[in-house]
Amino acid sequence: MGVVHDVWVVTKQLLEATALPWPAEERETWLSQVDELLRRRERLLHKLRPPYSEEEQRLGREIVAWNQEIEARLRQVRDEIRDDLRMAGAKRQANAHYVHPYEQPLSFDGMFYDKRR
């Protein structure tokens, strides 16, 4: 039961690491920890070889169920990061309008269109 149990242990650590709320200030630390756990689990998954005992099959079903929870949490973190990047871009653009107000027009509402030309 060695390799399957090791995969189960690493997956459980990964589940615990992704289940906690990640403050934005500590996100980089959490991401590096999750990345290391994913790399360790990947190395162990390459060592898995059948046949599996009943206990190993039970652990495997548990691993699959946990993996779905882990994927859902990582998708949520990805969306949070995407939103933060989008907000940072919007703030940067708004700041650029304040620094250089006449460089780009904010709107074209007051434009005059000459039909003759």
UniProtKB/Swiss-Prot annotation:
One of its GO terms (cellular component) is cytosol. Its main location: cytoplasm. Keywords: Bacterial flagellum biogenesis, Chaperone, Coiled coil, Cytoplasm. Residues 24-88 form a coiled coil. It is found in: Cytoplasm, Cytosol. It comes from the Bacteria. One of its GO terms (biological process) is bacterial-type flagellum organization. May act as an export chaperone for the filament capping protein FliD. Belongs to the bacillales FliT family. Homodimer. This is Flagellar protein FliT.
